[in-house]
Amino acid sequence: MFYCSKCNAPLQIDHSLQDANTGQLNLLTQNKQSVSAAAPKLNSVDFIPKERLELLEEVEKNGHNEPIHFLDTIEEHGTDSSPDHDSSPDASLVVNGGEIEEPVPVSAPSPESSEADGPNPISGRIHTLEKIFDILSNKGEVNHPMCDECAELLIENYKLKFDQNQREKDSYMTFLKKLKLKDDSDIKESDLDTKLRDSIQECRDLAASEQEKLQELRSLEQNREELSKELQDVKMELALQQSTELSNALRLKNELHWTLQRKADQLAQEKARYRVVLNRLDHLRNLNMYTKFFDIAADDQFGKINGFRLGYKVPWSEVNCALGQVVLLAVFLCKRLDVRLQSYKLVPMGSRSQIVKLSSDHDKSKTVLNLYSSNELSLGKLFNFNKLDVSMIALLDVLSQIEATVLALDSEIELPYTISPKKDVIGGKSIRVTSNSDWTFSCKFLLVNFKWILTYASSRH
């Protein structure tokens, strides 16, 4: 059983190979070396063996001008050989295009052939077919055997390559025609000679200029050496004078220079201190204490106040700290904007802050709403909602009252996210903790609105 070298599909060998006799298969396998050895030679005479040439000379001398017919010693499958031809199994002679091939002797059966005709002919034939496929694979770039589908794909690939090469050849031919049709005046020999002479003259001028510059450089080098020598003499003379009559004057000069340098350094230090103080003063003047105390930021996921995040899947310790900062910010804004809260009192106590909900004037009862949680659920009137839901709704109501005060002070201000305390919604998202991901967005919207009000309060003061 043979398999395709490309897709590994089982193959059915063609009947031309299945029905081939031992002599035909031996001819295919034995001619491999002779063909490969003769390929690199260029002389056609070298391709003909010496015995064939001698046979040709002998035939020409004997005057045999009759055509030589091909004697087929290979049996066809399902047909008998013709009685008109010599059926000798010893040799065959072929005349093709004026080239005479020597009789091909039928060699003694090899071990493989005898094994094929013997008790196990299938294994010998398979071994011979493997040799034939190896010869075909070594001669080309494609491995054999190959199924019909892979062969058709290979042929299509070669056709595409041929078409591509044909188009490339046409492009080159078109470009060559354009070059031939180009105006000959652009490439006249006289113009080339003129440009060549100009280039040679320019090269000579550059060489002459180079020599002039080199001469000038040598002159400058000589002057430099002379000046260096003079400088050395002056230095020696100056050293001699310093060692005698100018030593005291130079010492006094150095002392005065040192004193001046020290005073200049002190002046530079004082100027630097003055600039630092001025910069610090300008920084303090431009410092916004509101945003410094309450740093509110928001990214794609969470809102933050002073580095503490608010939202779903945030640790409760961090959420409690953030809510405490929000309560402190609300108290600060109420004092700055003179907001009088209705029915609420804010109690900032860090991560355990509270909102006290006051009843009507006649009833002095109050309800303490803890603005912190440990994720413990309470069963009762709130339909298993978290205790923090009521506190968050109260905080949203406080923000709504602060917004109303700001709008009363300046009607042109509009917060980015709409507040609906009756529906427990800000910016279209529920403020309830149990809303999970919506609570994250609503907390971020809450902080953004607080940041806008804080900016407005800082601009008023």
Curated annotation (Swiss-Prot):
InterPro entries: Atg6/Beclin, Atg6/Beclin_C_sf, Atg6/beclin_CC, Atg6_BARA. Disulfide bonds: none annotated. The keyword Cell membrane does not apply. Gene3D superfamilies: Autophagy protein 6/Beclin 1. Pfam families: APG6, APG6_N. The keyword Coiled coil applies. Residues 103-113 have a biased composition (Low complexity). Residues 194-286 form a coiled coil. GO terms for cellular component: phagophore assembly site; phosphatidylinositol 3-kinase complex, class III, type I; phosphatidylinositol 3-kinase complex, class III, type II. Belongs to the beclin family. Required for cytoplasm to vacuole transport (Cvt) and autophagy. Also involved in endosome-to-Golgi retrograde transport. PANTHER family: BECLIN 1 (PTHR12768), BECLIN-1 (PTHR12768:SF4). This is Autophagy-related protein 6. It comes from Meyerozyma guilliermondii (strain ATCC 6260 / CBS 566 / DSM 6381 / JCM 1539 / NBRC 10279 / NRRL Y-324) (Yeast). The gene is ATG6.
